[in-house]
């Protein structure tokens, strides 16, 4: 299996399965001298960790990350950083009944057809459990971006099913289990999720992620545009079926006089483009949104088939998130941070000596 790495100068490679012994990742390209400890990653891992909320899966994993290499006396050495998280709460017996049955809406069928076999225990490599290592690697990128360049990455749940955030107060995101920025909707969210659990069904969501402090110039046209790489990274997250940069699909209904971001020496007057122009960062906040489908692991019966081709009625057992969008918030932050870190190092390698006489502007 290829496709386990992302990045060119800041390269993250993950390995491991949902019910395997452990998950791991290798980070190549992190500059030396960055103070780094397991605690720097643990905060974001705890935000993603299962079993911490009644709104997410009941699987309980400590997700305690271990640094295997690349750090000496509390600082990165510039060599490969090896990270590992042990799996401790697998219940593989929950999946014994689907050993020969495909779960509709999951990767079971496609993995079987592509590789001629599959790890049926929780989806194996296709499980969102793998994203724990992306979050760990993203935490390294986030620390470097903030400490060295003042770049901050923040995500939040902007919509869960029919409930959308009408006000965005980022100070409230870490104060509730939904990572939701509109406190006036928390009671409605709680009630909606309770009813959803009773029905045995699941729901989709929209997650937004913003990066502030991003300098002008990141992005490598034509095929390595910054927005293209962001979309690639976010689309690589489990259950994501759509990505928007800036106004996204809303531009379909905009006129040119509405959608362009007017500018003056005082700054940009709007940010419809989401901080990227021509595939290059403009100095405005990077804004991206992603749509996540409802998980197919539900207790509502549905038709499927066996590996032998027989039709069966399927009910998925196990411990699953009724809305995967909640725990996707720190994952989205991690992937955006990894892309920005990679492009920052690439820009520095090629254009560090470039001096422009044009004044830099930001958001007015």
Curated annotation (Swiss-Prot):
Pfam families: Chorismate_synt (PF01264). The keyword Flavoprotein applies. InterPro entries: Chorismate_synth, Chorismate_synth_AroC_sf, Chorismate_synthase_CS. The keyword Transcription regulation does not apply. GO terms for biological process: amino acid biosynthetic process; aromatic amino acid family biosynthetic process; chorismate biosynthetic process. NADP(+) binds at residues 48, 54. Its EC number is 4.2.3.5. It catalyses: 5-O-(1-carboxyvinyl)-3-phosphoshikimate = chorismate + phosphate. GO terms for cellular component: cytosol. Pathway: Metabolic intermediate biosynthesis; chorismate biosynthesis; chorismate from D-erythrose 4-phosphate and phosphoenolpyruvate: step 7/7. FMN binds at residues 125-127, 238-239, 278, 293-297, 319. Its cofactor is FMNH2. One of its GO terms (molecular function) is chorismate synthase activity. Reduced FMN (FMNH(2)). It is an enzyme of class 4 (lyase). PROSITE patterns: CHORISMATE_SYNTHASE_1, CHORISMATE_SYNTHASE_2, CHORISMATE_SYNTHASE_3. Keywords: Amino-acid biosynthesis, Aromatic amino acid biosynthesis, FAD, Flavoprotein, FMN, Lyase, NADP. SUPFAM superfamilies: Chorismate synthase, AroC. NCBIfam families: aroC, PRK05382.1. Belongs to the chorismate synthase family. Homotetramer. This reaction introduces a second double bond into the aromatic ring system. This is Chorismate synthase. It comes from Shewanella denitrificans (strain OS217 / ATCC BAA-1090 / DSM 15013). The gene is aroC.
């Amino acid at each position: 299996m290829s496709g386990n790495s992302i990045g060119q100068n800041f390269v993250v490679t993950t390995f491991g399965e949902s019910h395997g012994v452990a998950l791991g990742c290798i980070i190549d390209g992190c500059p030396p001298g960055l103070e780094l400890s397991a605690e720097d990653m643990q905060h974001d891992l705890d935000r993603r960790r299962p079993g911490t909320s009644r709104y997410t899966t009941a699987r309980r994993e400590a997700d305690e990350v271990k640094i295997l290499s690349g750090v000496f006396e509390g600082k990165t050495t510039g060599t490969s950083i090896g990270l590992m998280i042990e799996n401790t709460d697998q219940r593989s017996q929950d999946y014994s009944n689907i050993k020969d049955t495909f779960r509709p809406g999951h990767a079971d069928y496609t993995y079987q057809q592509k590789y001629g076999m599959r790890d049926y225990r929780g989806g194996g490599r296709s499980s969102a459990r793998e994203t724990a290592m992306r979050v760990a690697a993203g935490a390294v990128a986030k620390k470097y971006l903030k400490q060295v360049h003042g770049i901050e990455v923040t995500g939040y749940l902007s919509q869960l099913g029919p409930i959308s955030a009408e006000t965005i107060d980022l100070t409230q995101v870490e104060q509730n289990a939904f990572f939701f920025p509109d406190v006036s909707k928390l009671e409605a969210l709680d009630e909606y999720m309770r009813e959803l659990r009773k029905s045995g069904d699941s729901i989709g969501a929209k997650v937004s992620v913003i990066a502030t402090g991003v300098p002008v110039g990141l992005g490598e046209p034509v095929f390595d545009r910054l927005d293209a790489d962001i979309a690639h990274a976010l689309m690589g997250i489990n259950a994501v079926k759509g990505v928007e940069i800036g106004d996204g699909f809303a531009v379909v209904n905009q006129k040119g006089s509405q959608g362009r971001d007017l500018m003056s020496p005082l700054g940009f007057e709007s940010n419809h483009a989401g901080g990227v122009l021509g595939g290059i960062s403009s100095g405005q906040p990077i804004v991206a949104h992603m749509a996540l489908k409802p998980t197919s692991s539900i207790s509502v019966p549905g038709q499927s088939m066996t590996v032998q081709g027989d039709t069966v009625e399927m009910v998925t057992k196990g411990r699953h998130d009724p809305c995967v969008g909640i725990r996707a918030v720190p994952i989205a932050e991690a992937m955006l941070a990894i892309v920005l870190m990679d492009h920052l190092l690439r820009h520095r390698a090629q254009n560090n000596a470039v001096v422009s006489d044009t004044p830099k502007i930001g958001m007015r």
